UniProtKB/Swiss-Prot annotation:
Encoding gene per record: hemA
Domain of life (superkingdom): Bacteria
Protein's recorded name: Glutamyl-tRNA reductase
Entry note about domains: Possesses an unusual extended V-shaped dimeric structure with each monomer consisting of three distinct domains arranged along a curved 'spinal' alpha-helix. The N-terminal catalytic domain specifically recognizes the glutamate moiety of the substrate. The second domain is the NADPH-binding domain, and the third C-terminal domain is responsible for dimerization.
Taxonomic source organism: Campylobacter lari (strain RM2100 / D67 / ATCC BAA-1060)
Extra facts: During catalysis, the active site Cys acts as a nucleophile attacking the alpha-carbonyl group of tRNA-bound glutamate with the formation of a thioester intermediate between enzyme and glutamate, and the concomitant release of tRNA(Glu). The thioester intermediate is finally reduced by direct hydride transfer from NADPH, to form the product GSA.
Length: 435
């Protein structure tokens, strides 16, 4: 049994390919999970899809042919050449997969180190996989331990102090290019990323105009944001594009919604910040139309990374420690029941043989208790060293091999996973809602 991860991120995959691999649509994500499980070696799966990454976390019976199956599935579903995907993807197995999961949850692998959105996105991905019955006890334990790791990183470092996001980085870039004070910035969309962009724009003393298909959502967001926020229907997009100078877009549209044909020629510059994947903006960049997509914000991100580099080193140390702790935790979950089963089996055999001895007259019934105590002492003495050594093996590389051998030799069933409640895990999501 193995943990496994196939990863496409801003580090290894261009935005054009990430657009095609986007699974923000639940129906598309559901179809991907269904196709993933056509390989019977894949026991559990979870798909995390954001503007900067697509991560496929798996628990598999055997890693052989898993890469090929996943790459072919993605190629078929997303229309991307399989060889192209193969050269871009990063593959992680066992401790590498868990270390990567913990790093992602702790925002150490994000475009913006320390951003606070990723944990919520991982929660949503986990809940969806659970709802679709694709995520079982193994990934559940890993994800919940990832939340524990993220909480430790947050509490023991300052990496998320003055939390930032892709939206805040985009606004910071806008502030470098133009004085935002008293300017009206148009924000297309009313989701989480748009809300963050609005808040940062308002903090920069700009005014915001929200354009959205769902007027009620836009109205509610404006009420939360205050008097310097207004809203209109997205039907007014063309008019807004030719009236204002600064635009931020973060919708879940499957195709571009701001295109060249909507733009009239102007004698002033317009600034477009596309913080969506797939991209919302398909405008030809020139001296009058300045366009920034997610991957164009690297310069601001590098400044952020430099400021947080020391805290990131501390955070990676925590992730490494938590990765080791996780596998030790799993080893104990396997080892302790085995020790208990050994003792129970020995006790049952002792009881059975003692009763046979009494029934056949080899032992007087009046001596039953004394004989029982003697047998228990012999049994405890015999099992002492195996029990101690099994506990010592917990967390080591040999642990699984020895446990499997012991189960085979003594014909012990693996009852550790039976009756486990997926909703009652070691680290409950509800207790970590603030991550």
């Amino acid at each position: 049994m193995h943990y496994y991860c196939i990863s496409f991120t801003h580090k290894n995959t261009d935005i054009a390919t990430r657009e095609k691999l986007s699974f923000s649509n639940e129906d598309k994500k559901r179809e991907l999970l269904k196709l993933i499980h056509t390989n019977n070696k894949i026991l559990e799966s979870l798909v995390l899809s954001t503007c900067n990454r697509v991560e496929i976390f798996l628990f598999v019976g055997d890693v052989e042919s898993i890469n090929e199956h996943i790459l072919k599935t993605l190629s078929l579903l997303c229309g991307v050449d399989r060889e192209n995907l193969s050269t871009k993807a990063d593959f992680y197995e066992d401790s590498g997969a868990i270390h990567h999961l913990f790093s992602v949850a702790s925002s150490l692998d994000s475009l913006v180190i320390g951003e606070t959105q990723i944990a919520g996105q991982l929660k949503d991905a986990y809940k969806f996989a659970l709802q679709e019955q694709r995520c079982g006890v193994h990934l559940t334990r890993a994800v919940h331990y990832a939340f524990k790791c993220a909480a430790n990183v947050r509490n023991q470092t300052e990496i998320s102090k003055n939390p930032i996001s892709v939206a805040s980085v985009a606004v910071a870039k806008a502030k470098e290019l133009v004085n935002l004070e008293n300017k009206t910035a148009v924000v297309v969309g009313a989701g989480e990323m748009s809300e963050l962009a609005c808040k940062h724009l308002l903090n920069a003393k700009a005014k915001v105009l929200i354009l959205n298909r769902d007027i009620q959502n836009a109205q509610k967001l404006c009420e939360d944001l205050g008097e310097n926020a207004s809203y209109e229907s997205i039907a007014n997009l063309k008019e807004a594009l030719n009236q204002y100078e600064i635009f931020f877009s973060a919708t879940n549209a499957p195709h571009a919604i701001i295109t060249n044909d909507l733009l009239e020629e102007k004698d002033y510059s317009r600034y477009f910040f596309d913080i969506a994947v797939p991209r919302d903006i398909d405008v030809k960049a020139n001296e009058k139309n300045i366009v920034y997509a997610v991957d164009d914000l690297e310069e601001v991100v590098r400044k952020n990374l430099t400021l947080r580099e020391h805290q990131a080193q501390i955070a990676y140390s925590i992730v490494g420690t938590m990765t080791n702790e996780f596998f030790q935790h799993l080893s104990k979950l396997a080892t302790l029941p085995l020790v208990k089963q050994l003792r129970l089996q020995a006790d049952e055999i002792a009881k059975e043989q003692l009763q046979k001895a009494i029934d056949k007259g080899y032992l007087k019934h009046s001596n039953h208790e004394e004989a029982r105590k003697l047998i228990r002492q012999v049994m405890n003495a015999f099992l002492h060293h195996p029990s101690v050594n099994l506990k010592k093996l917990s967390g080591t590389m040999q642990n699984d091999s020895v446990i499997n051998a012991m189960r085979y030799v003594f014909d012990l069933k693996n009852e550790n996973m039976e009756g486990l409640n997926l909703y009652k895990c070691e680290f409950n999501l509800e207790n970590n809602h603030e991550i």
